[in-house]
């Protein structure tokens, strides 16, 4: 539906999810339809300089650019991808369906949302389809 509005946190999360799904699946480029200075009436997800979608691109940049990609695992319920940036390990994980349980690797004790809000974790974490970054 081209007249559906996809904005804010939903747009941010969809961009992060699409980007990490693409990396996981070996898709080296993901193109967005249009980037405009102001919202365009026919598109559902707007890429403008201050949109939620662009905030998603900034999160992907912070989490992945400059990292060494160490591959992904998919247990059928959760996909997790290991990265290392400047010697610091991280894992990005998300549920393949509505929810899934994931235990972060040893040493990764914080879970960071796509809003870059981090909380301490230990043991299994319930994930949704929105990627979460686990860091030391």
Language model features: what each stretch is:
Residues 119-136:
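C-terminal beta-strand-rich structural cap/linker in extracellular carbohydrate-active enzymes
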Residues 1, 37, 95-97, 112-115:
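Proteins with a high burden of low-complexity, intrinsically disordered sequence enriched in S/T/G/P/A and R
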Residues 69, 78-82, 107-113, 121-123:
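Generic structural motif
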Residues 1-9:
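The substrate-binding groove and active-site-proximal loops of carbohydrate-active enzymes
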Residues 90, 98-120:
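Beta-strand-rich binding/interaction modules
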């Amino acid at each position: 539906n081209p007249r559906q509005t996809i904005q804010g946190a939903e747009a941010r999360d969809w961009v992060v999810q699409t980007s990490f799904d693409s990396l996981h699946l070996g898709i080296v480029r993901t193109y967005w339809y249009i980037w405009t200075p102001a919202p365009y009436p026919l598109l559902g997800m707007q890429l403008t300089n201050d949109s939620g979608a662009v905030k998603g691109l900034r999160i992907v940049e912070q989490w992945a650019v400059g990292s060494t990609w160490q591959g992904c695992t998919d247990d059928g319920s959760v996909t997790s991808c290991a990265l290392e940036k400047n010697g610091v390990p991280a894992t990005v994980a998300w549920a393949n369906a509505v929810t899934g349980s994931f235990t972060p690797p040893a040493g990764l004790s914080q879970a960071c949302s796509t809003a870059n809000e981090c909380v301490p974790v230990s043991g299994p974490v319930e994930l949704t389809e929105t990627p979460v970054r686990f860091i030391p």
